[in-house]
Amino acid sequence: MNVLGNYQSSGASWLSGGLGRFAYGEESYRPSLAFELNAEYRYRPLSSLEFKAYVQAQESNNSRSVSQVGIVELAARYSYDINFNQQVRVNVGQFFLPTSMENIDQFWESPYTLSFSSLNSWIGEEFRPIGLDLNYRHSFDDGNRLSAAVTPFWGNDSMGALLAYRGWSYGRQRTAYNDVLSVPKLMSLSDSGPFAGQRDDGTKPFGHDLDGKPGYALRANYLTERLSLNLTWVDNMGDTTLIDGEYAWRTKFSIAGVSWFVTDSFEVLAEASSGSSTMGAAPGVDISFYSAYLMASYRFSEYRLSARYDQFGIDDRDAMDQENNELGRSYTLALMWAGEESQFSVGAEILYLDSKRTRFLDSGDTESDTESVSLGLLVQYQF
């Protein structure tokens, strides 16, 4: 169970229908409070077969578009040992791909910071395969491991909508199945706009597949005692001409990640992603995007101190009148405490964001942002 307090200067949160970069707050300089309850059930009828369900409940003193209760993961995993050095694993259902270098704890939590990087904030919001993951792993005699995986998936056709309409954000949202997230009230989404077919209440990242065609992901990992290297490629193969209460997007991106334990206490990790997203028959939306972060983390006694530098951007490549360009960078400092024999943990974070983004609203106004700050506190109880 998590209790989160936040104070920020970015305006009304995007989850409240605004253009604020952060997940909490209906206006700037107003404290907000949120509660998260994450529950996981695992059942293992055989040593090689496991069923998993991850359910999330959340509440806030702000008006937010997310459901109070929802299923985040529901999957079955089968493992088969070919021999002493080789193993095959099959995952079926909806699940997080193990691409993130920072979201490594249970419930896709981060032990480093309260808010996720811009890249993993977006992954938590808009990308979670519903399909089959086939993973092959080879263990070398020296203990190092090399794995490769392929993942055909469905139900992620709207991936890219939040990036194009809203832009990058910072938070800890893990969108549940069939949940609907707010999008800004843009001129292009109004009844007289070119994309009036978008559902009025927002966008649904995960649910019924819109075009019936699978997307796919490819990834590889190399793991040693102190080093982990990840490479991932994702293409949702969306039919950009389809409108079914929601527009289908064709979103493709790559991720490269590294985690290096310089010492037992000091870790350096980084991820970089680059991709593109298109929607609609020409002249539709066409953007390219990137996000990258570098983080250093030091553990001492029962504490962890982490510093993260994050940079992101979107390049609007289409000829439409709406504005999708943006550029930003942030600096995050977080201190976390977790007692070895305590069920409680506590964290505090400050995030400074310098960004450039302009959006044309259906009211006729133009909204731009520059600098903003987020202060966060977290109290966590595990039982």
Predicted features, each with a name:
Residues L4, E26-A164, N221-E225, M295-Y298, ...:
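Outer membrane beta-barrel
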Residues G18-A23, T113-L119, G197-P205, D239-L242, ...:
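Extracytoplasmic loops and strand-loop junctions of Gram-negative outer membrane beta-barrel proteins
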Residues G5-L33:
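Surface-exposed strand-loop-strand hairpins of Gram-negative outer-membrane beta-barrel proteins
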Residues W122-T224, T232:
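Aromatic- and glycine-enriched pocket-lining scaffold segments that form the walls
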Residues S13, S65, E102-Q106, S158-S169, ...:
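Outer-membrane beta-barrel and related beta-rich outer-membrane complex signature
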Residues S13-R21, V69-I71, Q106-Y112, A164-Q173, ...:
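Flexible, surface-exposed loop regions and adjacent strand-edge segments
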Residues E26-L33, S65-G70, S121-R128, H208-G212, ...:
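Short sequence motifs at beta-strands and strand-loop junctions characteristic
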Residues G212, N221, S228-F383:
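Outer-membrane beta-barrel pore domains
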